[in-house]
Structures are given as structure tokens and as C-alpha cells.
Amino acid sequence: MSPEIPPEWKKFRYRGKSLEDLLNMPMDEFIKLLPSRQRRSLKRGFSDKQRRLLEKIRKISREGKQNKVIKTHVRNMVILPEMVGLRFAVYNGKEFVEFQVVPEMIGRYLGEYSITTKKVEHGEPGLKATKSSLFLAMKG
């Protein structure tokens, strides 16, 4: 991440730690701050896909391409402090849903911001869909 942190992010605190503290903190200490599910997930280590994504994130951060969208299918990656400010496009099974990581997302999963299902919007029932709809056709 670039050394310049926006002023609105300086007020952010995660479990009593500022964003700067989280960025400078070793991974072992950061893991202790996470909720149990995320903590256990990270203690097991990263999968190959997660490791490749992390390498890609670090490469983009080093090059200073903060606005480049990182496309991924890895929904089970925990959002780490070094991901703040980056843009991701996470696959939801049909398309890539794009979003920017803000400090409030730390400790959550990438998949939480790419919803896989959409709200069902029922239309009018079709002809013969219900027993009463048989009589609607006769009326009209």
C-alpha cells in the first residue's frame, strides 16, 4: 500500500489498533485479533490459490498500481490490512462483482462482498399455473 493514507481512514480502528499499526504488525499478531473462524483459517495456512492471489496483491502494491482491478475466483480469502485501498473483482458464479477494499472490511472474506444469489422477484402466474388461473382465461 502507498505510504499516503487518506484522512478518513486514519480514524479507523480495528480492535483498538489503527490502520498504520495493522500494516506494520507481523502476521502472527494480526491473526490473534481476528474472529475465531478467520483466525483458524489463517492458522492453517494459505492454499495455493490464496498464495498466488497474495503474491499478485503484493506485486501490484509494489508497482503502485492501486487502481488496477484484481480479478479472482478466490472467495475464501480473508481481507488483510495490506489489501486496503485495492480494487477487486470477485466471481459470484455468473459475473465478476467489483468493489474497493476499505478498512472496515478487514477480517472479512472477499466472498462476502460478491453475493451469489439474487432476490427472487415473482411475476404474475402463468396460464394453468394455479387452479384459479384456469377461470381467468375464460373471463377475458
UniProtKB/Swiss-Prot annotation:
Keyword Lyase listed: no
Molecular function (Gene Ontology), one example: structural constituent of ribosome
Keywords from the UniProt entry: Ribonucleoprotein, Ribosomal protein, RNA-binding, rRNA-binding
Cellular component GO terms held in the UniProt record: cytosolic small ribosomal subunit
GO biological process: ribosomal small subunit assembly; translation
Alphabetized InterPro entries for the sequence: Ribosomal_uS19, Ribosomal_uS19_CS, Ribosomal_uS19_euk/arc, Ribosomal_uS19_SF
Superkingdom classification of source: Archaea
Pfam families per the UniProt record, alphabetical: Ribosomal_S19 (PF00203)
Gene3D superfamilies linked to this entry: 30s Ribosomal Protein S19, Chain A (3.30.860.10)
Function in brief: Protein S19 forms a complex with S13 that binds strongly to the 16S ribosomal RNA.
NCBIfam families in the record: PRK04038.1, uS19_arch
Family indicated by similarity: Belongs to the universal ribosomal protein uS19 family.
Protein name listed in UniProt: Small ribosomal subunit protein uS19
Native organism: Sulfolobus acidocaldarius (strain ATCC 33909 / DSM 639 / JCM 8929 / NBRC 15157 / NCIMB 11770)
Source taxonomy: Archaea, Thermoproteota, Thermoprotei, Sulfolobales, Sulfolobaceae
